[in-house]
Structure formats: C-alpha cells, structure tokens
Curated annotation (Swiss-Prot):
Phosphorylated by ATR in a RAD17-dependent manner in response to ultraviolet irradiation and inhibition of DNA replication. Phosphorylated by ATM in response to ionizing irradiation. Phosphorylation at Ser-345 induces a change in the conformation of the protein and activates the kinase activity. Phosphorylation at Ser-345 also increases binding to 14-3-3 proteins and promotes nuclear retention. The active site is at D130 (proton acceptor). This is Serine/threonine-protein kinase Chk1. ATP binds at L15, G16, E17, G18, A19, Y20, G21, E22, V23, K38. It comes from Gallus gallus (Chicken). Residues 391-476 are annotated as: Autoinhibitory region. It holds the Pfam family Pkinase. Residues 272-329 are annotated as: Disordered. One of its GO terms (biological process) is DNA repair. Serine/threonine-protein kinase which is required for checkpoint-mediated cell cycle arrest and activation of DNA repair in response to the presence of DNA damage or unreplicated DNA. May also negatively regulate cell cycle progression during unperturbed cell cycles. This regulation is achieved by a number of mechanisms that together help to preserve the integrity of the genome. Recognizes the substrate consensus sequence [R-X-X-S/T]. Binds to and phosphorylates CDC25A, CDC25B and CDC25C.
C-alpha cells in the first residue's frame, strides 16, 4: 500500500529512523524512479537546528561515486525534507557475518571504496566523524557509498586547517585522541575509523568497546597480543596494515596516501569475487543492462489476523543509516518536482508501505524491478500462517527477555541491550506473500553486528517453524 506524498510520488517503505525523524523510500508511480527521503521533525531538533543546516550545506558540496548523492531539500512547516540517492544494496553491516566477517577480497574492495570516498571528503575539507558499517551503504552494483553527514564538519577551508575539539561519533570507532586531547586533527580520526571498519569486515566483530586503557581488549592490542580475537582471524598482510592504521599516536598513524601504497591494499583482487570490473575509484561497473526504476503500484495488504488493528503511536527521529543509491540522472524533471514539492501528506503507519514482492523470485527468473529493493539477509519464511508466526515469535522473544511492543498492524518493535550494555532496537514485519509469511527484521537503533547476532539467535530458537525455502536475494 503506497501513500501519496507529492504529485506522482508515493512513500512506499520505511528505511530507518532515529532521534529526530525517519527515512522513507519515495517512488514515482509514472517513471518508477526511487529516492530516499530523510524527514526531520524540526520541533524535535529544536535544540540543534544549526546541525541540520550544516548537514544540508555539506551535502550540497559533495558529488562522488562513493558518497550518497544529495538531490536537494525542502522545508514544509516544521518538517525538513532531504532528498537522497537510494541504495538498494542496504547497509554494509548486513554483509558481515557475526564473528566470521566476509571473504577477504570482498573486504578489500569495500575498503578501497571507503578510502576513495574519504579521500574525496578530505579533499573538500570535510571530515565525516562517524564512519561505521551502519553509515556505509551499498548500491545495486554493490558499490560502497558513505552516508549520513549529521556529525560531519568542515576542517579545512582555503588551504587552512583547523583543529577539532568536539568529541562525537560511536565509541568503538572513535580514535583514542578524542578521549584524551582537548584538540586533535580531523584526518587521522577518519583514518582510524576506517581501520575499525576493516577489522569488522575481516573478523566479524569489533576490536574493543572503546580505545582507552580501561578497556582490556585495547590494552591487549597495544601490547600486540595478536594471538587473541579478533586479530587471530585476520591474515598477516591486512593485519600489518591494521597495525599502521590503529596506531595510538595520531602523528605516527599511517596517512591515506601511504595506505594506498600498502602491499595488501594494492594486491590484485582474486578472480571470481565480483562481477564486472572496477573503475579507478574502486567502483564496480557491471556488464549488461540494469533496471533503472522501481514500480509502486503493487497491491499489498498487511497481515491483520495476528496483530489486530493499529493502536501504537509513532515517533519520528533522525534517520539511522540506511539511505542512498541512485539509478538515474538527477537532472530529471520528476525529481526536481519532488524536491520542489506541491502537497505533502504523511503516512499514518509507515510500515504498511512495505512492498509486496520485493524479495520474491526464483533463481534464473527475470527480475522484476521490485527485486532491486533493499537486499537484506535478516529475513526468513515460516511454515506457519500469520497467527502462528506471530505467536511463535512473541513466545521466543519473551523467553529471551526482549522488550516487545506492537507498533503497527503487521509490525512489532523489539528492544534489548547488546553485549556492551547499549540499547538495541529492531523492527519485525510479518508480510504475507503469495500465501507465505515472510518475517523481516530491520535494525532501528544500535550496532549492526549486534543486531545480526540477535537475529541469528531468534532464528535459531525458531528453527522448528522456519521454512527451508530460501529468501532469494538477487545478485549485485
């Protein structure tokens, strides 16, 4: 069920939410173009309106193949709309298997693309300050895109660099100087975060809670105890690079030009690890035609029998990572009209707009445009009907001590704490697809790797009712 937004445009899916708003997927019913719309409630952001303005200004400055494209913005009353590239490949963390990681050639390619994006940002005098897998998106060709510039700032202008003094970011990814020094340089901070992201990709876990002497894992790293996890899971060549990146002293830390000369970084990718070829910026250029549009007219009725009528209120919040990836020329008139806007209307229950056939298909069949919607591994079919699926999920979550709240007719919100005692919130949607029930999990707040760990635990507890039928994901 699509909800009209602006003339010819429908909001069809919630992509993410946070403290001040949410991100919705908008689809043009005539041209089938897709755009991510970041919707910010300026009343909720009343304490930091300048941050929103700065985010818009920074987005306007950027244009790079490894950075989510910004199409424009519009203010409508107390609501600010940011129109961004839509990335159908989802978040990077979804490709990381908890405690395992991903194949080394894959990690190398994503790391090269991350570095290419950071090089560009720094060349524009911009530092991101919150690089992590949740803020790194993948397009339909599995190209990495840096997203979410809510914490970004300008550190260099007209060749003059300023030191930073604000501690911000996500603790496992922040550089140690943020915790110790009143002022610090911007570029080494982003370099450090890239190293933590690479560790997560290669080992499937974060190296520490925070880079301080009070953290045993960090102390072990400084003492070069690489026989411990996660380092023992990483090959010697990338580990040697990580030693140079995750160097405590920022003046001794490797710079990006030297990273690009590193032996492992420059090693040719193994054959058979990707489709197409890689451009000079590390972007995969897949052969053959790619679908450029997404339909928005599929009829979809959410599961009602199990969860009853709508009865929960919604809070809009600043979008968590989860937007990006365009498939068309942004100069098209339809996108211009979307940005300019005519009549805006908000959905009563955003998750009712989940798409009916976004996952359905059989290997070898021709793909419909729906199958280019967000690819996620955190979903499965069940052997039960809607009522049975709902009850089984509820019983397992209650036994595991999770918080449980019905959010929408076909959605529940589950809350818990992760291994670091941080809040973890995810949404679960029960979708009826051709007489089958798909249980779809989406991270709402918290660490992506921890979210995947909890998903796997829940799926394991539901093994008796999980269908052996695979949720086929279209290849990149």
């Amino acid at each position: 069920m699509a909800v009209p937004f602006v003339e010819d445009w429908d909001l069809v899916q919630t992509l993410g939410e946070g403290a001040y708003g949410e991100v919705q997927l908008a689809v043009n019913r005539r041209t089938e173009e897709a755009v991510a719309v970041k919707i910010v409630d300026m009343k909720r952001a009343a304490d930091c309106p300048e941050n929103i303005k700065k985010e818009i200004c920074i987005n306007k400055m950027l244009n790079h193949e490894n950075v989510v494209k910004f199409y424009g913005h519009r203010r409508e009353g107390a609501t600010q709309y940011l129109f961004l590239e839509y990335c159908s490949g989802g978040e990077l963390f979804d490709r990381i298997e908890p405690d395992i990681g991903m194949p080394e050639p894959e990690a190398q390619r994503f790391f090269q693309q991350l570095i290419a994006g950071v090089v560009y940002l720094h060349s524009m005098g911009i530092t991101h300050r919150d690089l992590k897998p949740e803020n790194l998106l993948l397009d339909e060709r599995d190209n990495l895109k840096i997203s979410d510039f809510g914490l970004a700032t300008v550190f260099k202008h007209n060749g003059r660099e300023r030191l930073l003094n604000k501690m911000c970011g996500t603790l496992p990814y922040v550089a140690p100087e943020l915790l110790r020094r009143p002022e610090f340089r911007a570029e080494p901070v982003d370099v450090w975060a890239c190293g933590v992201v690479l560790t997560a990709m290669l080992a499937g876990e974060l190296p520490w809670d925070q880079p301080s002497d009070s953290c045993q894992e960090y102390s072990d790293w400084k003492e070069r105890k690489t026989y411990l996890a996660p380092w023992r899971k990483i090959d010697s060549a990338p580990l040697a690079l990580l030693h140079k990146i995750l160097t405590e002293n920022p003046t001794a830390r490797i710079t990006i030009p030297d990273i690009k000369k590193d032996r492992w970084y420059c090693r040719p990718l193994k054959k058979g690890t990707k489709r197409g070829r890689v451009s000079s910026g590390g972007v995969t250029e897949s052969p053959g035609a790619l679908p450029k549009h997404i339909r928005s007219d599929t009829d979809f009725s959410p599961v009602k029998s199990a969860l009853g009528e709508d009865k929960a209120s919604y809070s809009t919040s600043q979008p968590e990572p989860g937007t990006g990836g365009a498939l068309w020329d942004s100069s098209t008139g339809s996108i211009d009209r979307l940005v300019q806007g005519i009549s805006f209307s908000q959905p009563a229950c955003p998750e009712h707009m989940l798409l009916n056939s976004q996952l359905l298909g059989t290997p070898g069949s021709s793909q419909s445009p729906w199958q280019r919607l967000v690819r996620r591994m955190t979903r499965f079919f069940t052997k039960l009907d809607a009522d049975g699926s709902y009850r089984s999920l509820r019983d397992v979550c209650e036994k595991m001590g999770y918080g449980w709240k019905q959010s929408c007719t076909n959605q529940v919100t589950i809350s818990t704490t992760d291994r670091r005692n941080n809040k973890l919130i995810f949404k679960v949607n029960l979708l009826e697809m051709e007489s089958r029930i798909l249980v779809d999990f989406r991270l709402s707040k918290g660490d992506g790797l921890e979210f995947k760990r909890h998903f796997l635990k829940i799926k394991g507890k539901l093994s008796d009712v999980v269908s052996t039928q695979k949720v086929w994901l279209p290849p990149p």
